[in-house]
Regions:
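Short S/T/G/P-rich N-terminal loop/turn motif that feeds into the first structured element of a domain
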Residues: 1-70, 76-93
Length: 93
């Protein structure tokens, strides 16, 4: 199993709005949304689990082939954050 974390640092005052946008992203039904309690301020994390890397790759292909109207709806969310990164972690049993 793999855990994928998309970690965003929101612009000041935009963390709650970014969190709402991330919660409505398509193809992320299993995602958990996390926010900072201590540590770096304005952090929003979308954490998802995948059985294998092929499942993750399939989700990414679906995500990148969204219809134009959905892409347009999501275009503004990049204005809400100043940096981001992705972590792909293997779960060790």
């Amino acid at each position: 199993m793999y855990v994928v974390r998309d970690i965003f640092t929101a612009k000041p005052g935009m963390a709650s709005k970014l969190m709402k946008e991330v919660m409505t992203m398509p193809n992320s039904p299993r995602a958990r949304i996390l926010t900072d309690l201590v540590g770096d301020y304005n952090t929003v994390v979308m954490e998802s689990e995948y059985k294998d890397l092929a499942s993750y790759e399939k989700m990414m292909q679906e995500y990148t082939s969204q219809p134009p109207e959905l892409r347009q709806k999501m275009a503004g969310y990049t204005d809400l954050w100043q940096s981001g990164r992705r972590e792909v972690l293997r779960v060790v049993d």
